[in-house]
């Protein structure tokens, strides 16, 4: 753990013992099992006392790091399939979950709990489902007088249980939910938010990230394979809805058992200055081949028509 001026190290020794060193010290201040780090970014009280004034600095630094880590929300690439109905325990969950399994609980709380800010989440989710053109409205319905509720999707005048609609909606629902549920100022890490979505909906995800980032001071870290999402992000920069400094993009190159991240350099028009080779395949080559084949096929058809007429 370090600042610009100081560096603190806890090095593991034999039999589970740790030694504590500051800056470029070659000899440890002390070593022993009682100096084992806590949660990898802080040291126990014995080590803090041992370091004296440096201990207070390390304690403040560790606390700052832990607070930053607590502001990170992670959602994995495969979200849990929805149930046909859910029991609501009249409380608000503390998290969406790494597989999105609490997303529906969040929506139930948003729809059913009283409060000026409660409906914000379900309204935000519904708005983006409409913009993605995958639904007209999302609704929570009570089953009789029970504590069980179902999530209903309205589309083209038809309503259906969430479990009965396309899997793309159930996969993107936790993504939309966490965008509004995470506390303002959070960092949201998403893997493949575009999974099972059609191209337009994938593109709209870029708009979601841009708008929610500004509205709620959210930083999104997104791992994606979607060219549609990437292209729309470029367009948003060209439209001046974002600046090139608002959206950093990286290309991950795998070499053997290791991987390297290469920053993509974008200008003010969203154009990439340093395209990696075959980043999106040979798009220009595909277009050229399609055009050549279309011309050749058109000539063949005209020749065939001429022979028939003769």
Regions inferred by a protein language model and the residue ranges of each:
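P-loop NTPase switch/coupling surface
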Residues: 1-79, 140, 237-243, 247-254, ...
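Switch/communication elements of ASCE P-loop NTPase nucleotide-binding domains
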Residues: 116-298, 303
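Intrinsically disordered regions, especially transient/low-confidence alpha-helical propensity segments
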Residues: 5, 15, 83-85, 125, ...
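A generic signature of intrinsically disordered, low-complexity regions enriched in glycine/proline
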Residues: 27-28, 109, 271
């Amino acid at each position: 753990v370090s600042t610009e001026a100081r560096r603190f190290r806890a090095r593991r020794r034999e039999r589970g013992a740790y030694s504590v060193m500051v800056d470029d010290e070659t000899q440890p201040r002390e070593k022993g099992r009682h100096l084992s780090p806590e949660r990898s970014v802080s040291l126990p009280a014995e080590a803090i006392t041992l370091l004296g004034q440096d201990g207070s600095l390390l304690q403040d630094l560790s606390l700052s790091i832990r607070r930053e880590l607590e502001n990170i929300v992670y959602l994995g690439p495969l979200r849990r399939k929805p149930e046909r109905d859910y029991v609501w325990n009249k409380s608000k969950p503390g998290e969406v979950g790494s597989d999105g399994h609490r997303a529906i609980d969040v929506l139930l709380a948003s729809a059913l709990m009283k409060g000026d800010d409660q409906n914000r989440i379900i309204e935000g989710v519904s708005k983006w489902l409409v913009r993605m053109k995958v639904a007209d409205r999302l609704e929570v319905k009570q089953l009789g007088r029970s504590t069980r509720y179902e999530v209903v999707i309205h589309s083209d005048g038809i309503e259906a249980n969430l479990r009965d609609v396309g899997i793309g909606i159930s996969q993107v629902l936790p993504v939309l939910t966490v965008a509004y549920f995470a506390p303002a100022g959070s960092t949201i890490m998403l893997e493949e938010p575009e999974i099972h979505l059609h191209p337009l909906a994938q593109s709209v995800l870029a708009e979601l990230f841009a708008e929610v980032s500004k509205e709620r001071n959210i930083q999104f870290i997104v791992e994606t394979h979607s060219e549609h999402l990437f292209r729309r992000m470029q367009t948003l920069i060209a439209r001046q809805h974002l600046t090139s400094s608002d959206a950093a993009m990286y290309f991950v190159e795998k070499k053997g058992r290791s991987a390297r991240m290469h920053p993509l350099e974008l200008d003010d028009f969203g154009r990439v200055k340093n395209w990696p080779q075959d980043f999106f395949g040979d798009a220009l080559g595909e277009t050229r081949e399609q055009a050549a084949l279309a011309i050749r096929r058109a000539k063949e058809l005209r020749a065939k028509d001429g022979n028939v007429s003769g």
